């Protein structure tokens, strides 16, 4: 499904059921904008991630695309359940969504892969540009010039993406 705000609870329940029956991952855009998170908290009393957790959608086969506006509780839940995050730095900058807390996610043990989101919100589907931006954004947001080294960015764009897709160690 595109995002939690586009799918009601009964449909989410069916998605979870089919994903479990067929051993398929669930991927969705999650906490991409502040407005999305605020709207979800008003509607359900929970963050978008916690709503999906209550519906049984989260776990090792869950892939959260963006995760820009996740809080500490969300990060802890993502890590505890073995969920994956796909960081889309170019898209998040182009759409002024914000900057994902990648270093906090990594420090918590969340598998973070890199993505482009798509041509409409990116203009270029260039994995090297995504690696560069992920590294630079991490440095500027943490104040640590060593944050997300080139080798880490390369791993996020390759092996960590494969891991998120359930391909294991390739």
Question: Across the structure, where does each feature detected by a protein language model lie?
Answer:
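Glycine-rich, flexible loop/turn motifs
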Residues: 36, 48, 89-91, 127, ...
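Short strand-loop junctions, especially beta-strand C-caps/beta-turns
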Residues: 2-4, 88-90, 115-117
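Short, acidic/turn-prone active-site loops that include or flank metal/cofactor-
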Residues: 32, 89-93, 118-120
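Histidine/acidic residue-rich metal-binding segments in metalloenzymes
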Residues: 1-84, 96-112, 129-132, 169-170
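His/Asp/Glu-enriched, well-ordered alpha-helical/loop segment
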Residues: 54-61, 103-170
């Amino acid at each position: 499904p595109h995002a939690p705000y586009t799918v009601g609870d009964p449909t989410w329940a069916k998605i979870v059921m089919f994903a479990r029956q067929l051993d398929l991952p669930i991927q969705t855009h999650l906490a991409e904008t502040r407005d999305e998170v605020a709207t979800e908290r008003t509607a359900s009393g929970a963050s978008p991630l916690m709503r999906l957790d209550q519906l049984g959608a989260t776990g090792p086969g869950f892939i959260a695309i963006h995760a820009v506006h996740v809080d500490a509780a969300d990060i802890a839940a993502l890590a505890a359940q073995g969920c994956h995050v796909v960081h889309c730095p170019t898209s998040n900058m182009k759409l002024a969504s914000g900057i994902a807390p990648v270093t906090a996610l990594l420090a918590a043990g969340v598998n973070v892969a890199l993505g482009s989101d798509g041509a409409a919100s990116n203009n270029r589907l260039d994995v090297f540009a995504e690696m560069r931006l992920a590294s630079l954004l991490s440095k500027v947001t943490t104040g640590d010039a060593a944050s997300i080294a080139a080798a880490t960015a390369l791993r996020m764009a390759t092996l960590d993406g494969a891991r998120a897709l359930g391909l294991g160690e390739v």
